[in-house]
Amino acid sequence: MHWTPEHAQPLNQWPEQHLDVSSTTPSPAHKLELPPGGRQRCHYAWAHDDISALTASNLLKRYAEKYSGVLDYERPGLGSYGDAAFLNGAKGDPEPWPGPEPPYPLASLHEGLPGAKAAGAGGSAGLGGSPVVAGNLTEPLYTGNACGGPSAATEYAAGYGGGYLASGYCAQTSAALAPPPPPALLQPAPPPGYGPSAPLYNYPAAGYAAQPGYGALPPPAAPPAPYLPSGLAAPTPLPAPAPPRPAPYGFPAAAEGVSLKRKAVDEGAEARYRKYAYEPAKAPAADGASYPAADDTECRGNGFRSKPPGATEDGTGKYGGGGPLKVLGSPAYAPQLEPFDKFPERVPAAHGGFAEPSGEPAKGVDPGALELVSSKMVDCGPPVQWADVAGQGALKAALEEELLWPLLRPPACPGSALPPRTVLFFGPRGCGKALLGRCLATRLGATLLRLRGAGLAASGAVEGARLLQAAFAAARCRPPAVLLISELDALLPARDDGASLRAPLLTCLDGSCGARADGVLVVGTTSRPAALDEATRRRFALRFYVALPDGAARGQILQRALAQQGCALNERELAALVQGTQGFSGGELGQLCQQAAAEAGISGLQRPLSYKDVEAALAKVGSRAPSKELDSLVEWDKMYGSGH
């Protein structure tokens, strides 16, 4: 028969069992317990599919023969008792059988084995007849055919299968050996694909019904019931495993789960970008373009419509709605962003923070002025983060603690005090005051409206007041919003002759601090804070001084500006350049790099920018902030500044 790994465990026990049974030294009690124990282990192994049905049938048959040879029978056998070593049983022992209990009754087994009562030594034939045992033992148990009887193959019936007898087995005569068992005790033909192509046994396929198969596989052949003696209980077959059932909750498949997980990650990233009112870059367009085409009808995610297609650019520089980016700005590319009404997640106005977008049209405001503000004064530049502002570490920390945190988390404010709604940045020109205002809008996820005080003052008192009121109304209509008014001192002339915008400005500032202006932050910048009167100064709850950049900040600004020109300086050259630009503002450092690029292009040769070009430009560009002005700014900060 074919070898399978499931034979390993039972066959490892055969040499020990054979030696114990055939030896004359063990006690009769030990020989009494050995065959039933082996039979129980065989039952257990077969019931748990550790061995095949063919192996179980062979082992059980041998155990039955051994057990019949061990028991003591009342009827004497034919002939005298042999003294050979292979004869065993109670009658082969010189001492009586000392069993604690009477012999195990197996009347039905004896009836099925007629030769068991005729010869008490027939048990060894079942053990020695296994070719597996003969192959496992180091020496053959029986050599040759010394007994002189006929071979086992001629003595047994054809259906028994003489191939299971060892070639060296000492066969006996018909009178001494037990007759072959009936066909009902033998194993049926193995299932298809197992063992030889032709079946060794031919038995009727009777037995219990086949169990349902697993999935689409055909069920295995069921072993018939009559292959065991009637006295041995057949092991209970294990139930076949149930076919797979779908999940009760309908979970998606593996591929769908991966896509859902990726979708959740994308939504999480989108939620993080929603906080700052911009999103990551879109997927490539269907036509193969690197980025999707920009929509000319909408501006950067803030709900305000851009200028009409045929509008001119006259008002851009006039009102400060857009212009060339400063050197401290973020990279030139800005991803396309969704309309602002997609991101209404704000703290309710009842807590004093930013309110939900109202969507109601402004009342009492000129529609033409509101359209002008929505088209030309909304900043559409890229978002600015804290890292885009070089230096100013103490100022950033103060803004986070005193302004951003109360606005974004109003319940954390002590008492019933409302968070600040106005902030003033003052300092020398070109120090990044407007850049800080843009950064606040990004941190708050708010719409940014930019107004230039000089442009409003130049448009006249009536037109300037109309535009100023329209800007505040537009900010209130679409909160959260940040209204950035640069050059605030231009709106407050030294002489109040009725043509200034002081009164409309104070009125709008008072309205921005009331309950109607929830979600609006007003940011004013000036380089001459001393020009502000006391009434205007008190309208700004927070006042911060933006100083000139220090050495580390100047090095960072120079590296960014020169990298845009394709120039990379080594550490020594950069340190020398930082030392030579002491007292420069961020704007002046940007002008220095532009002048160096112009110096490199004068020669007409396409060569990269070098340190010599920067040195040549440094001789032409110098610091413009006098020390007297810097001292006055420091004094004003000590008197009226919020301190940081």
From Swiss-Prot:
EC number: 3.6.4.-
Biased composition (Low complexity): 285-294
Binding-site positions, ATP: 390, 430-435
Keywords: ATP-binding, Cytoplasm, Hydrolase, Nucleotide-binding
Swiss-Prot/TrEMBL catalytic activity: ATP + H2O = ADP + phosphate + H(+)
Compositional bias ranges of the Polar residues kind: 10-27
Pfam name, any one: AAA
Any one Gene Ontology BP term: negative regulation of cell migration
Cofactor(s) of this protein: Mg(2+)
Presence of the UniProt keyword Cytoplasm in the record: yes
Cited function: Microtubule-severing enzyme that negatively regulates cell migration and wound healing. In migrating cells, targets dynamic microtubules (MTs) at the leading edge and severs them, thereby suppressing motility. Microtubule severing releases ARHGEF2 which activates RHOA, which in turn regulates focal ahesion turnover via focal adhesion kinase, as opposed to F-actin polymerization, to suppress cell motility. Negative regulator of axon regeneration that suppresses axonal growth by selectively severing dynamic MTs in the distal axon shaft and growth cone.
Protein name: Fidgetin-like protein 2
Gene name in the database record: Fignl2
